[in-house]
Amino acid sequence: MRVAVIAVGRLKQGPERELADRYFERFDEAGRKLGFRELSIHEIPESRARDAATRMAEEAAAIGAYIPDKSILVALDERGQNLDSTVFARHLGRWRDEGAGHTIFVIGGADGLSPELRRKAKLAIAFGSATWPHQMVRVMLLEQLYRAATILAGHPYHRA
């Protein structure tokens, strides 16, 4: 199963980028052994439209270009479910075992994701009830992907 992260906004050089790169590499290595192929990250430019609805619509259109048909879409949204790491890992493992070709995680911009994208998502998840900068959400998502791979592999990284 291919896993992709589509994020509105760029992750600039600095500590967040270094941490994201570290978890990207760790998941890529651990995930290959578990049937997860080709983790990819696509950065979508932030819309410069004046109103939020137009910005979200433009960003949703750009995001949609990276979503293959029959993909499992997971929205990162503050209104989403708070999943513990083990449940998150079970979702990922189940989708892989059911033969999903692609699982796509989508991180919105400053205004969040369009209602249309949220409706299309098979699952919406949140990292707590707080609102997080998209840079931090990307790092946390990549860490959770790596953690999920270690849980599925029975590796001791996750010690809950």
From Swiss-Prot:
The gene is rlmH. The keyword Protease does not apply. InterPro entries: Alpha/beta_knot_MTases, RlmH-like, tRNA_m1G_MTases_N. Pfam families: SPOUT_MTase. This is Ribosomal RNA large subunit methyltransferase H. It comes from Bradyrhizobium diazoefficiens (strain JCM 10833 / BCRC 13528 / IAM 13628 / NBRC 14792 / USDA 110). GO terms for cellular component: cytoplasm. Belongs to the RNA methyltransferase RlmH family. HAMAP family: 23SrRNA_methyltr_H. NCBIfam families: PRK00103.2-3 (NF000989), PRK00103.2-5 (NF000991). It is an enzyme of class 2 (transferase).
